[in-house]
């Protein structure tokens, strides 16, 4: 038990000549530098930052004298205590043969005249960064370890241009002077005070003195005032003639002193600013041999060749400055994190990106996008909408058809002279959502029987109807046709003029009625009804509409064409003979029908034969000259014409040899009730065949291209892989040599370097 108490007491007693370990910071200064001990647990990086904030750096004891000063400062610390010093080594930078073993000082160099390693150098790959720490007890040797571990404290070093000695104790002084260093360490146990330190002296008389370690005009560094520091009163009411402060001497004399940042002028009373004309690049402080000293801001250090200039310090060379990535720039550095990590608030550490941060970023991005879209909507003007429907396009594979054109003289309601002609080229598909119309009506021109003109059915008052020349189906009878008036037939020979007979037929089915019949129903007063041309005959308007009974039927017969005359002669002679005297009318010219001119009349049965019966003159309505009416545009109905007509539309220009529109009478539309013919069906078949050609072309073009490519590949193959030498058998390439020694002199000698008696040839396997 006694032995244990003795050992505990020995461990508690400090070693001889060494300062005991205290938890308070302390410092030891020399003529050119100061070392300060801060017993606070820090990592290497944190310790380096703490020293930089105070204007210094981690301790770099390069000489034995500096090492001895460090030993006296550390004294006796804990048995296992460690203190960081300014030595570090980067990964894979081992140099065991050098004094510092690959370590460098935090100042960036490897110059040293002193080392104190605790362990010998070893050969190794040095895969990680290492930092050096000083033992707090014993011989204060250097140990290397991980830079991220926190140790018991750290040592800082502060360099200055000069230092002032400690003030001696004077008579009348209340106690030792208290010094405040530039690195904010307050103590009264300094032997040397760095440049810029302040000494506070307390006198017994109640007054004190404050001194500043500054540069002297003669050179060097000294205190701003010399003793005695505790004089009697003698400044008087005018402050002793001093500009700033007046100090009374012991013998009653007074001395002047300047405030911080100023120095006493040569007259001893006024004060001047030493940094007003100092050539410092960044910061200037009064003091020093020249009255001022230049300092650099954080991130810079004084240049070695010129103390007035400042150069950048590469902080990224210090191990552990940043947790992941470090970027150095002039005057500082910045830490970055790899993908998936984010920088913490301290600006050094990195942590994995959390879900809350990612969600906040996404919300911010969505908010910015929403704001951008709202801005675009506000800037985009609204388009004006007139409230009308847009006409849809028809089916793309159905080509729009146009009503036939029979030339300029046969168009109704010609424009006046000088009025420009306009082409009405519009598609014929019906607009969407259109109102229901009446039954479909079409006029059919048959190519197998003579043309019959009937004017007993006028055009219905609809803007969507047009006369259609169709060869596909017979006309449909209207539901409520308007009242109709007969028209005068074209002029023929007098010997063939047979009067018409008006007869009343009962209502019969379509198949039991006479060959060509048009029914007349009670008249009604429709709106304006422009006539529509359905054949090549001029249109003639009757002067009035004669009322007829509801059951009245009008049958119109045309005389047969004489055998000795062709249809062309009949129509041509009709231009020269006037109408009968009992049938008043207008002398007109009927142009040839393209159907009768190109297709001869075919024999028909008795039902389809044409007969005429004389009709009294009183029953024939007189014709009257036509009056021009505004043209009506045909829409929403297709027109199918026979193959003898051209599909192209004639231009609306006057032609020579054609009467003026004003002098040509017009006839009402003549709807034909002839049945479909083979010629019309062949026209539709030709149109369908024309549509099928595109499919054939679409199939043939790729096929031809493919055949051309195959032909080209075959030609290339034949030219590249031509005929080769015939293959030989294996017995033709080798032969047995039985008498190698009896080889005749006539046998050719094999070439030098080749196998004797072996023939080479190319064989195929």
Swiss-Prot record:
Domain (C-type lectin) spans 30-156
Q: List the disulfide bonds.
A: 131-147, 164-213, 203-230, 316-326, 322-335, 337-350
Which GO CC terms are listed, alphabetically? cytoplasm; plasma membrane
In this UniProt entry, which residues form the Extracellular topological domain(s)?
Answer: 18-695
Its principal location? membrane
> What happens without the gene?
Cd248 deletion mice display a delay in wound healing. The show reduced activation, proliferation, and collagen deposition of fibroblasts in the granulation tissues of wound. They are also unable to mount a sprouting angiogenic response to muscle overload. Genetic deletion of CD248 in mice, overcame diet-induced insulin resistance with improvements in glucose uptake and lipolysis in white adipose tissue depots.
Q: Which GO terms describe its molecular function?
A: calcium ion binding; carbohydrate binding; extracellular matrix binding
So what does this one do? Cell surface glycoprotein involved in various biological processes including angiogenesis, immune response modulation, and tissue remodeling and repair. Participates in pericyte proliferation through positive modulation of the PDGF receptor signaling pathway. Acts as a scaffold for factor X, triggering allosteric changes and the spatial re-alignment of factor X with the TF-factor VIIa complex, thereby enhancing coagulation activation.
Gene3D superfamilies assigned to the protein according to its UniProt record, in alphabetical order? Laminin (2.10.25.10), Mannose-Binding Protein A, subunit A (3.10.100.10)
Protein name per the record: Endosialin
* Modified residue annotations for Phosphoserine: 754
InterPro entries on file: C-type_lectin-like (IPR001304), C-type_lectin-like/link_sf (IPR016186), C-type_lectin_domain (IPR051505), CTDL_fold (IPR016187), EGF-like_Ca-bd_dom (IPR001881), EGF-like_dom (IPR000742), EGF_Ca-bd_CS (IPR018097), Growth_fac_rcpt_cys_sf (IPR009030)
Give every EGF-like domain span. 312-351
Q: Signal peptide: which range, if any?
A: 1-17
Composition bias, Polar residues: 635-647
Please give, as recorded in its UniProt entry, the membrane topology of this protein. Single-pass type I membrane protein
Q: Is Membrane tagged as a keyword?
A: yes
TM spans (from-to)? 696-716
Q: Where is the composition biased (Pro residues)?
A: 622-633
A GO BP term here is:
fibroblast proliferation
Q: What upregulates it?
A: By wounds.
């Amino acid at each position: 038990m006694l032995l244990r108490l003795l050992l505990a007491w020995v461990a508690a007693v400090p070693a001889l000549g060494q300062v005991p370990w205290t938890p308070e910071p302390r410092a030891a200064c020399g003529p050119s530098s100061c070392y300060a001990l801060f017993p606070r647990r820090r990592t290497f990086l944190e310790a380096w930052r703490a020293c930089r904030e105070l204007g210094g750096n981690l301790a770099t004891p390069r000489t034995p004298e500096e090492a001895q000063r460090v030993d006296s400062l550390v004294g006796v610390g804990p048995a296992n205590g460690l203190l960081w010093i300014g030595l570090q080594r980067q990964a894979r930078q081992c140099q065991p043969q050098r004094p510092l073993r690959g370590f460098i000082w935090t100042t960036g160099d490897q110059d040293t005249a002193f080392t104190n390693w605790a362990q010998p150098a070893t050969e190794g790959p040095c895969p990680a960064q290492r930092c050096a720490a000083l033992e707090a007890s014993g011989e204060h040797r250097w140990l290397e370890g991980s830079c991220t571990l926190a140790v018991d404290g750290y040592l800082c070093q502060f360099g200055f241009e000069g230092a002032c000695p400690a003030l001696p104790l004077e008579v009348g002084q209340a106690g030792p002077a208290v010094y405040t260093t530039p690195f904010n360490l307050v103590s009264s146990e300094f032997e040397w005070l760095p440049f810029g330190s302040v000494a506070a002296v307390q006198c017994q008389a109640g007054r004190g003195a404050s001194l500043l370690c500054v540069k002297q005009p003669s050179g060097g560094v000294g205190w701003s005032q010399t003793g005695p520091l505790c004089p009697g009163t003698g400044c008087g009411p005018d402050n002793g003639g001093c500009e700033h402060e007046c100090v009374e001497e012991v013998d009653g004399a007074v001395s002047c002193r300047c405030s911080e940042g100023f120095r006493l002028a040569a007259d001893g009373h006024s004060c001047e600013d030493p940094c007003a004309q100092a050539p410092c690049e960044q910061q200037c402080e009064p003091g020093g041999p020249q009255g001022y000293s230049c300092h650099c801001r954080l991130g810079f250090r004084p240049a070695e060749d010129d103390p007035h200039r400042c150069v950048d310090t590469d902080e990224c060379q210090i191990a552990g400055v940043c947790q992941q990535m470090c970027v150095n720039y002039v005057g500082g550095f910045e830490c970055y994190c790899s993908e998936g990590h984010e920088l913490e608030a301290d600006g050094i550490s990195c942590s994995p990106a959390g879900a809350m941060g990612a969600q906040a970023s996404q919300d911010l991005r969505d908010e910015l996008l929403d704001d951008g879209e709202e801005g675009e909507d506000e800037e985009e003007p609204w388009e004006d909408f007139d409230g009308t429907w847009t006409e849809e396009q028809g089916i793309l594979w159905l080509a729009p058809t146009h009503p036939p054109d029979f030339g300029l003289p046969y168009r109704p309601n010609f424009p006046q002279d000088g009025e420009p002609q306009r082409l009405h080229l519009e598609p014929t598909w019906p607009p969407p959502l259109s109102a229901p119309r009446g039954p479909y009506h079409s006029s059919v021109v048959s190519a197998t029987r003579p043309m019959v003109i009937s004017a007993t059915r006028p055009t219905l008052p609809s803007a969507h109807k047009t006369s259609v020349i169709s060869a596909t189906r017979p006309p449909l009878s209207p539901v409520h046709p308007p009242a109709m008036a007969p028209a005068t037939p074209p002029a023929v020979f007098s010997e063939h003029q047979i009067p018409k007979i008006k007869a009343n037929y009962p209502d019969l089915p379509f198949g039991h009625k006479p060959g060509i019949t048009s029914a007349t129903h009670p008249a009604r007063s429709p709106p304006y009804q422009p006539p529509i041309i359905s054949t090549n005959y001029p249109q003639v308007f009757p002067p009035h509409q004669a009322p007829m009974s509801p059951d009245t039927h009008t049958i119109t017969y045309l005389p047969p064409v004489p055998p000795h005359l062709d249809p062309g002669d009949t129509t041509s002679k009709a231009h020269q003979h006037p109408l009968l005297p009992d049938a008043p009318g207008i002398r007109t010219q009927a142009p040839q029908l393209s159907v009768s001119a190109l297709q001869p009349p075919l024999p028909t049965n008795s039902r389809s034969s044409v007969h005429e019966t004389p009709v009294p003159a009183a029953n024939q309505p007189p014709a009257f000259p036509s009056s021009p009416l505004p043209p009506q545009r045909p829409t929403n109905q297709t027109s199918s014409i026979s193959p003898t007509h051209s599909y192209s539309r004639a231009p609306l220009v006057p032609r020579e040899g054609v009467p003026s529109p004003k002098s040509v009478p017009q006839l009402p539309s003549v709807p034909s009730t002839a049945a479909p013919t083979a010629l019309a069906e062949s026209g539709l078949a030709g149109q369908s065949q024309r549509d099928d050609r595109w499919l054939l072309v679409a199939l043939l073009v790729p096929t031809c291209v493919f055949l051309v490519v195959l032909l080209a590949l075959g030609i290339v193959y034949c030219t590249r892989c031509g005929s080769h030498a015939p293959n030989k058998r294996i017995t033709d390439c080798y032969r047995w040599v039985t008498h190698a020694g009896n080889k005749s002199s006539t046998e050719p000698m094999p070439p030098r370097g080749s196998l004797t008696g072996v023939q080479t040839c190319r064989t195929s396997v």
